């Protein structure tokens, strides 16, 4: 399945460049309205002033499917250790995971327990085997697909982050660089 990643117009009001994935599709049309039959929910118009407007764009929600990977996942060891830490506090807490500027590579991971009532409406809430993870929208851009692991090894133990969005990580594994 191809996804449109960019739309450009030229000085000719009937010329549309549509970038799909990593390839460019350019087509010259003789009318001011362009429709994409395979994308029946999108109808694009080019007016005479070289402006591109979207008349309608409603995407049906994907059906809930079993077996989908969560946006952020926990290894079995991380889940056990976090559950133990949460139970020691004796409260109904969730884990907030995020990123902030800093660290050896430019961005560092943040993790802390917080009361579920503190979750904001725009936060992503991920239920993972009975454990709740909360992440703000900006951090989710950098953490989507990440797996949190835990090791109790004497050397190199603790939490580790396996982040598919990281282009570079520091030696300690607590900070990373990502291109957006």
UniProtKB/Swiss-Prot annotation:
Q: Name one GO cellular component term.
A: chloroplast stroma
Q: What is this protein called?
A: Iron-sulfur assembly protein IscA, chloroplastic
Q: How is the cofactor bound?
A: Binds 2 iron ions per dimer. The dimer may bind additional iron ions.
Q: Which InterPro entries match?
A: FeS_biogenesis, FeS_cluster_insertion, FeS_cluster_insertion_CS, HesB-like_dom_sf, ISCA_plant_cyanobact
How is the subunit organization of this protein annotated in UniProt?
Homodimer; may form tetramers and higher multimers.
Q: Which gene encodes it?
A: ISCA
Q: Which organism is it from?
A: Arabidopsis thaliana
Cofactors required = Fe cation
Q: Give the primary localization class.
A: plastid
**Which compartments is it annotated to reside in?**
Plastid, Chloroplast stroma
């Amino acid at each position: 399945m191809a996804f449109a990643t960019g739309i450009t117009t030229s000085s000719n009001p009937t010329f549309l460049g549509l970038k799909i994935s990593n390839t460019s599709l350019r087509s010259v049309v003789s009318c001011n309205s362009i429709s994409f039959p395979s994308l029946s929910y999108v109808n694009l118009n080019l007016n005479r002033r070289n402006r591109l407007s979207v008349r309608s764009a409603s995407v049906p929600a994907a059906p809930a499917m079993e077996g989908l990977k969560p946006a952020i996942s926990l290894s079995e060891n991380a889940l056990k250790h976090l559950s133990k830490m949460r139970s020691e506090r004796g409260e109904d807490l969730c884990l907030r995971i995020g990123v902030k500027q800093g660290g050896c590579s430019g961005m560092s991971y943040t993790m802390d327990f917080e009361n579920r009532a503190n979750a904001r409406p725009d936060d992503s809430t991920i239920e993972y085997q009975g454990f709740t993870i909360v992440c703000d929208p900006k951090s989710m851009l950098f953490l989507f697909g990440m797996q949190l692991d835990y090791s109790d090894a004497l050397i190199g133990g603790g939490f580790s982050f396996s982040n598919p969005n990281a282009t570079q990580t520091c030696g300690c594994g607590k900070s990373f660089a990502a291109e957006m």
